[in-house]
Amino acid sequence: MSNVFQNTSTVTVLQGDYKVTTDPKVVFSTVLGSCIAACIYDEQVGVGGMNHFLLASSAGSGGVSARYGVHAMELLINGIMKKGALRSNLKAKVFGGAKMSANLSDIGANNADFVQRFLRDEGIPVISSSVGGTSARRVRFHACSGAAQQTHVADDRRLGEEERAAVARTQAAPARKPAAADNVTLF
């Protein structure tokens, strides 16, 4: 499986983003602390994607943003299915959810619990997961085959500081109203 990572182009998935591809030459990459990356794929069709969400849900009502778990998951699943995936073929790999700071509530554990519950409720099997702990991870995901690589990030103090700042901004930002282009068909 490691051969699928050779001779590929890397596409970075940032916080609050998701990417989907059918191109076997593309590998998605992200760095996670307390955030979660769900890697969902249909290896029979050769399509998959990765999201990267910051919080399981918004503190206020109406937080429609890919920064939040439910919306991020719906965007990813819908994006994969629009590229031809069959729902019955979907599989998932889940990463992240670390406790990055003693000063934060255990956002990572909440995120990990959310994504596991969401995938179970949607009937999408989690083939593998690496969640929790206290260190950041770098994840690479070959979406067409479902192959994934994870390495722990040695010096993750800066990532913890960045996550604290991102959480504070997210909690302080008013929820935006979705534009027509943001409408998603939920299933």
From Swiss-Prot:
It comes from Ruegeria sp. (strain TM1040) (Silicibacter sp.). InterPro entries: CheD-like_sf (IPR038592), Chemorcpt_Glu_NH3ase_CheD (IPR005659), Cytotoxic_necrot_fac-like_cat (IPR011324). It holds the Pfam family CheD. Keywords: Chemotaxis, Hydrolase, Plasmid. It catalyses: L-glutaminyl-[protein] + H2O = L-glutamyl-[protein] + NH4(+). This is Probable chemoreceptor glutamine deamidase CheD 1. GO terms for molecular function: protein-glutamine glutaminase activity. Probably deamidates glutamine residues to glutamate on methyl-accepting chemotaxis receptors (MCPs), playing an important role in chemotaxis. Coiled coil: none annotated. One of its GO terms (biological process) is chemotaxis. The keyword Hydrolase applies. SUPFAM superfamilies: CNF1/YfiH-like putative cysteine hydrolases (SSF64438). Its EC number is 3.5.1.44. Belongs to the CheD family.
